[in-house]
């Protein structure tokens, strides 16, 4: 597990945490990342940790009432959130296994498929897993 104290500081007068990127990058090598371009939405990440592939999707908001990280009042709470996100990553043993999952997953049966960013993420991930545009 990641120790969030290496990613975030707890200081006098701290008004909270808002940036998920340190956590996202601490989980591994980001191969593809697509975020919604809005004040609230989802982040989708494909990891490639030396051939072990990870898939993470999580939502975020614009205030402490609708965003889990902004709602954290202590680093212990940030740690709990980080652990939950890390544990929610779906891991595949190989690119081939991940590619099969991406190609056969019922994306159309999911609410997230109706967002252009999800379609972009899926398409970029498939291209990456097929070996195309590995410099994404």
Predicted regions and their residues:
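Residue-level marker of intrinsically disordered, low-complexity segments enriched
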Residues: 2, 30-32, 124
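Charged, compositionally biased non-catalytic regions
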Residues: 1-18
């Amino acid at each position: 597990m990641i120790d969030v104290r290496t990613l975030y500081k707890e200081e006098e007068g701290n008004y909270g945490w808002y940036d998920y990127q340190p956590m996202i990058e601490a989980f591994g090598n980001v191969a593809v990342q697509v975020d919604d371009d809005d004040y609230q939405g989802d982040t989708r990440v494909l990891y490639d940790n030396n051939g072990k592939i990870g898939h993470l999707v999580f939502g975020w908001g614009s205030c402490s009432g609708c965003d889990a990280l902004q709602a954290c009042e202590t680093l212990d709470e940030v740690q709990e959130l980080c652990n939950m996100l890390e544990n929610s990553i779906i891991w595949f043993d190989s690119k081939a296994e991940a590619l099969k999952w991406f190609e056969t997953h019922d994306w159309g049966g999911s609410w997230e498929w109706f967002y252009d960013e999800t379609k972009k993420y899926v398409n970029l991930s498939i291209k990456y897993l097929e070996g195309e545009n590995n410099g994404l």
